[in-house]
């Protein structure tokens, strides 16, 4: 059946690394098989199948057999019962002097699934060669019935002491004393390394006849041979038939007990010339033909005792000895002196080589073959870490023989200059299969150049190698390559992934370990990351064991298990990684710790194997080794639960109330919840599984819109029993009452799980266990339920244009305003200094069908803050903003939720405040309307109302000035000494203060100071210019001009006012930036130039210091006052010292007298002097009274 899209998505997400962390290995009921901890029972484990009977093969490399710690292998039943030791430690290799103590049998195990046999190796098995013990290693092959079948020891070489030595003693009467000969014989025998695979000795004695004292194979130890030699008595005889004795030894002694391939050595001891000397030539020739090396010892006691010249005797003995004589011929003065040549004779014999010299004679003696093992089609690969001076090698044992690559075969990747590093090649061996190259062998060398290396190669019968690829480790001491595993993910017979362990990788202060992943691409393995551990910062040795196991989770892909035996304070843990589509998911699906399984487990995970179904339930089980224990983990069947949900009817029609619930009209519906279990393993196709589900209505709402008819208001919990492959459906009745929100669908959520998760099947860790399906409301539009609205949005602001500002604020006539706006763009709007807000009048109208979930999106530029939205009273709907935080640059408002009716209209006003922290040259407000309904593209253009303005701000500045000097009178007696030789000082201040809301910039203060007349007479000296703002930059021009020190005569009576138009000036330009409420003071400090002011001709004059504010061309600010400027006036007056000429005085006097005379005459003519007499009356007494 088709799966809902949600299930597929959830399943795909679960396959993503880290999405889940559960798995189907049962940790509640493991089988823990105990063994000896001192023997390290559990160091290696292998699952074994014998005719359908399942066993566990467990290695115990420190197991004892008798008095020797040989190691051994156990077979253990998987269900119940005790383990049985196979006593492989008692297996003896014939014809060698072996040493089995500490040979570590069971250190490596390899099973052969073709014939159900397995190989158990003892890499430290050694054998005696002379005075040395060679640790060549040995493996034992065990058949399907747990019976030893053969030994495998490809590195075993014949010793240098592999010799058959026959001692030919002259026992004639002339030998005296015999006891000295016996002492010599015993001493030389003690020098020999007698034993299997080494020297064996036979003794013949001759005189007139020849007899066997003992044959070559009679005794197998020095002790026995010495004991036998001590009982040899002198046979006697009157003749010395040396040729006969040599021929007897050649033809009979070497045949009876002689070994094929052994070096034949003959030691002839005689004290006189032979009586059959004519036969010597033939006898010696036959000995040469049989490759018998002859040592001849001449005892001169008989000749010395009788004073006979021994020259002829010595020549005969030298003829008997092999060439050269100096190495094979000895002579002693008498029988007692034989003891003196024992050491020399022994050294010369042992200088012989037991086999022909070849390249491997001295390269494999310490090879430790079997340190690792791997079964291939035609035999077995064995790692030999000690071969070639511990650089290591890989040997191959087949039914046709053995293949031992030459040392030179490895030089390409293991150069001669690094031979002393001890690479340990063969520490682990495995193989991969590619479609082009077939089977390729893989071997690890964890100590190569201290970082480790892995090589991929093929081996040829001519003892050469072809190395196809090499991989090198990253970190010194990480032991990269100590564990290697190839993985065929999809089971097609071709390797997909090669995993390389570096268990000692040091990270964050701990030996955490690392496992590298290499994927096969075009016949090369390419690095593709690493597997992840638990991120627990501890010494874990993650990657100490890596096992490719068959499909554990029943998804048809093989999996990987990695051991970390030192995790959790050496308790140990394993990690299970799933295979998926040709690769390995790098996050573990399950981490199993030793503490979950049993108490006291240590080094859990040191070995892992998982290829068989051990309990006959159709599932692959795991075998894991630990210190003194072997643990079997059982797999649980995996089930996938397919869930689906549908509704009848398919939509909620709130306009059709078809039932009553709680006395109210309601819309009734039914949900059908269906489950189908799918067991992944074929063995479980008739199994049942119990699940429990929880169903919830409108789970994310505080008050649900739908209600269940039975059980809880919005929850139901039920248990059901499902049969494999069969669908079971549950009916859940529910109803919907009146609700304000019938736009968003009602969500039905289902969660389900196993009824008994601790037993039986387990839910697939990559399969969803939740289901969410929604049932929509019917929208009430036309028959196709497709609503087509037509939203129209209109908006305008209250900002004035430049023309409107000129007419309304500046109150200028239209003609003057036209000239005023010429300097502005037509899109410029003016922000008055008193304005703090911007208002937008807007309307939203729906000219089409119902618009569901209509929203109004309001956005503004950063220099505005949303203040409020006020709806007009005559609106047909409502509008509510859901986020009115002032700092947000966007607001979302719901319009008549849940739907905006057809032909409805809503009017509203928006207010925005200017930001006090952000200043921009422009202003943007955008209103956009939209809905969940599908409006036609042709009508969407008017859904947006953008308002964009280029701004000019009215600067609100206070511009003032002050001065310490406004008037000065120049007097004739004014002294320069009072003013330091210059003149009276002055201090002027121009002050600008920003009273507005916005920071002001793009303005310039321009100050002009008349400093001299056009004739070069200095008027004043500007001593200093200061501002109280460090970031205000000013430029000063004209203050450095040098004027004449002595003023010249100049009449200024016609120029009562001196300014920049008729004087030389100092100009100061300053760029101004003012934040709100900031002020800047410009200080002018100087002195009047009194020397010139006294010399110039004037009565009174004014020196005008002018300061003007100017806006720069691109400044966003304007001034309400045209060209604002301020002046400071220095009014200078002067007193004159006049001298009147004499003629003026005389003329003035005479003129005054003449004027007086004319005045008197005129008065006389007018009767001025007669008027008093004419006014007297006739009757009056003219005579005055007399005082008596």
UniProtKB/Swiss-Prot annotation:
Residues 1-22 form the signal peptide. Residues 23-1141 are extracellular. Keywords: Calcium, Cell adhesion, Disulfide bond, Glycoprotein, Integrin, Magnesium, Membrane, Metal-binding, Receptor, Repeat, Signal, Transmembrane, Transmembrane helix. Ca(2+) 3 binds at residues 613, 615, 617, 621. Ca(2+) 1 binds at residues 488, 490, 492, 496. GO terms for biological process: cell adhesion; cell adhesion mediated by integrin; cell-cell adhesion; cell-matrix adhesion; collagen-activated signaling pathway; integrin-mediated signaling pathway; muscle organ development; osteoblast differentiation. The keyword Cytoplasm does not apply. Its main location: membrane. Residues 164-345 form the VWFA domain. It is a single-pass type I membrane protein. The chain crosses the membrane at residues 1142-1164. Residues 1165-1188 are cytoplasmic. It is found in: Membrane. Ca(2+) 2 binds at residues 551, 553, 555, 559. According to PubMed:10464311, highest levels of expression in uterus and heart, intermediate levels in skeletal muscle and intermediate to low levels in pancreas, kidney and placenta. According to PubMed:10486209, also found in brain, colon, lung, small intestine, stomach, testis, salivary glands, thyroid glands and prostate. Very low levels in peripheral blood lymphocytes, fetal brain and fetal liver. Heterodimer of an alpha and a beta subunit. Alpha-11 associates with beta-1. Interacts with RAB21. The integrin I-domain (insert) is a VWFA domain. Integrins with I-domains do not undergo protease cleavage. This is Integrin alpha-11.
């Amino acid at each position: 059946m088709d799966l809902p899209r949600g299930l597929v998505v959830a399943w795909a997400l679960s396959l993503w690394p880290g999405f889940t962390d559960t798995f189907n290995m049962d940790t509640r009921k493991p089988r823990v098989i105990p063994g000896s901890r001192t023997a390290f029972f559990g160091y290696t484990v292998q699952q074994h199948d014998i005719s359908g009977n399942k066993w566990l093969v467990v290695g115990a490399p420190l197991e004892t057999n008798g008095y020797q710690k040989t190691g051994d292998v156990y077979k253990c039943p998987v269900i119940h019962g005790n383990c049985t030791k196979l006593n492989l430690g008692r297996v003896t290799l014939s014809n060698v002097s072996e040493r089995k103590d500490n040979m570590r049998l069971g250190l490596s195990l390899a099973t052969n699934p073709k014939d159900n046999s397995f190989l158990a190796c003892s890499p430290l098995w050694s054998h005696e060669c002379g005075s040395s013990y060679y640790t060549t290693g040995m493996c034992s092959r065990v058949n399907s019935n747990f019976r030893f079948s053969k030994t495998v020891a490809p590195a075993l070489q014949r010793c240098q002491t592999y010799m058959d030595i026959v001692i030919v003693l002259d026992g004639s009467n002339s030998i005296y004393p015999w006891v000295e000969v016996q002492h010599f014989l015993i001493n030389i025998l003690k020098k020999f390394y007698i034993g299997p695979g080494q020297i064996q000795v036979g003794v013949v004695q001759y005189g007139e006849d020849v007899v066997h004292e003992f044959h070559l194979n009679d005794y197998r130890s020095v002790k026995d041979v010495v004991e036998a030699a001590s009982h040899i008595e002198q046979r006697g005889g009157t003749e010395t038939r040396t040729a006969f004795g040599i021929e007897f030894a050649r033809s009979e002694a070497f045949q009876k007990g002689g070994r094929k391939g052994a070096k034949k050595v003959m030691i002839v001891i005689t004290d006189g010339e032979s009586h059959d000397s004519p036969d010597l030539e033939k006898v010696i020739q036959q000995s040469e033909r049989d490759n018998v090396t002859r040592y001849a010892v001449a005892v001169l006691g008989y000749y010395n005792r009788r004073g006979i010249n021994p020259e002829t005797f010595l020549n005969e003995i030298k003829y008997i000895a092999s060439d050269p004589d100096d190495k094979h011929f000895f002579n002693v003065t008498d029988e007692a002196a034989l003891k003196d040549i024992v050491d020399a004779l022994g050294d010369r014999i042992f200088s012989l080589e037991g086999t022909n010299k070849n390249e491997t004679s001295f390269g494999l003696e310490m090879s430790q073959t079997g340190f690792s093992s791997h079964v291939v089609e035609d035999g077995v690969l064995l790692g030999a870490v000690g071969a070639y001076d511990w650089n290591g090698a890989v040997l191959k044992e087949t039914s046709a023989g053995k293949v031992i690559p030459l040392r030179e075969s490895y030089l390409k990747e293991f150069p001669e200059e690094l031979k002393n590093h001890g690479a340990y090649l063969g520490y682990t061996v495995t193989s991969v299969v590619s479609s082009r190259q077939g089977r390729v062998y893989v071997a690890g060398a964890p100590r190569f150049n201290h970082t480790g290396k892995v090589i991929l190669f093929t081996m040829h019968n001519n003892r050469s190698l072809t190395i196809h690829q090499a991989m090198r480790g990253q970190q010194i001491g990480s032991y990269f390559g100590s564990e290697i595993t190839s993985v065929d993910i999809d089971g097609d017979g071709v390797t997909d992934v090669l995993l390389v362990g570096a268990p000692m990788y040091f990270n964050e202060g701990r030996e955490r370990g690392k496992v590298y992943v290499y994927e096969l691409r075009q016949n090369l393995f390419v690095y593709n990351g690493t597997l992840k551990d638990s991120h627990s910062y501890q010494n874990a040795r993650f990657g100490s064991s890596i096992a490719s196991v068959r499909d554990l989770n029943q998804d048809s892909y093989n999996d990987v298990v990695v051991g970390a035996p030192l995790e959790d304070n050496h308790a140990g843990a394993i990690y299970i990684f799933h295979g998926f589509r040709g690769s390995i998911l790098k996050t573990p699906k399950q981490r199993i710790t030793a503490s979950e399984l049993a108490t006291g487990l240590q080094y859990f995970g040191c070995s892992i194997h998982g290829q068989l179904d051990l309990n006959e339930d159709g599932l692959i089980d795991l075998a894991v080794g630990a210190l003194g224990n072997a643990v079997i983990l059982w797999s649980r069947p995996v089930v996938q639960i397919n869930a689906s949900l549908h509704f009848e009817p398919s939509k909620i029609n709130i306009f059709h109330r078809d039932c009553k619930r709680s006395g109210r009209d309601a819309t009734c519906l039914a949900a059908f919840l269906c489950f189908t279990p799918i067991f992944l393993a074929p063995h479980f196709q008739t199994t049942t599984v119990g699940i429990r589900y929880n169903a919830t209505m409108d789970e994310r709402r505080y008050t649900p819109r739908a209600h269940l008819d039975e059980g809880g208001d919005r929850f139901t919990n039920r248990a059901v029993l499902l049969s494999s492959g069969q669908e079971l459906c549950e009916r859940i009745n529910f109803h919907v009452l009146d609700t304000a929100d019938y736009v968003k669908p009602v969500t039905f959520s289902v969660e389900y799980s196993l009824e008994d998760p601790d037993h039986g099947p387990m839910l697939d860790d990559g399969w969803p266990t939740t289901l969410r399906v929604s049932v929509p409301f019917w929208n009430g539009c036309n028959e196709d339920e497709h609503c087509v609205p037509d939203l129209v949005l209109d908006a305008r602001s209250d900002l004035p244009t430049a023309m409107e500002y000129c007419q309304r604020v500046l109150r200028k006539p239209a003609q003057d305003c036209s000239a005023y706006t010429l300097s502005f763009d037509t899109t410029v709007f003016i922000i008055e200094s008193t304005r703090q807000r911007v208002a937008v009048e807007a309307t939203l109208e729906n000219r089409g069908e119902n618009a569901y979930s209509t929203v109004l999106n309001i956005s503004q530029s950063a220099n505005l803050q949303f203040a409020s939205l006020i709806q007009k009273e005559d609106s047909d709907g409502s509008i509510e903003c859901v986020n009115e935080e002032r700092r947000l640059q966007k607001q979302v408002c719901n319009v008549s939720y849940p739907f905006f009716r057809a032909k409805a209209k809503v009017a509203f006003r928006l207010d925005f405040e200017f930001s006090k922290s952000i200043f921009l040259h422009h202003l943007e407000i955008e209103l956009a309307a939209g809905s969940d309904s599908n409006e036609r593209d042709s009508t969407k253009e008017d859904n947006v109302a953008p308002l964009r303005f280029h701004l000019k701000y009215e600067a609100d500045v206070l511009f003032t000035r002050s001065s310490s000097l406004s008037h000065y009178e120049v007097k004739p007696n004014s002294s320069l000494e009072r003013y330091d030789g210059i003149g009276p000082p002055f201090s002027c201040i121009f002050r600008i203060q920003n009273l507005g809301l916005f920071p002001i910039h793009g303005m310039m203060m321009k100050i002009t100071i008349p400093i001299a007349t056009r004739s070069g007479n200095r008027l004043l000296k500007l001593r200093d210019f200061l501002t109280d703002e460090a970031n205000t930059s000013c430029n000063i021009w004209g203050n450095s001009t040098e004027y004449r020190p002595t003023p010249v005569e100049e009449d200024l009576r016609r120029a009562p006012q001196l300014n920049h138009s008729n004087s030389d000036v100092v100009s100061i330009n300053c760029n101004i930036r003012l934040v709100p409420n900031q002020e800047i003071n410009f200080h002018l400090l100087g002195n009047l130039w009194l020397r010139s002011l006294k010399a110039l001709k004037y009565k009174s004059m004014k020196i005008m210091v002018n300061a003007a504010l100017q806006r720069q061309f691109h400044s966003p600010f304007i001034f309400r006052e045209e060209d604002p400027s301020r002046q400071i006036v220095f009014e200078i007056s002067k007193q004159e010292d006049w001298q009147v000429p004499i003629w003026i005085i005389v003329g003035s006097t005479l003129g005054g007298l003449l004027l007086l005379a004319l005045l008197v005459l005129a008065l006389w003519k007018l009767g001025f002097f007669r008027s008093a007499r004419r006014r007297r009356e006739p009757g009056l007494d003219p005579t005055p009274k007399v005082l008596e």
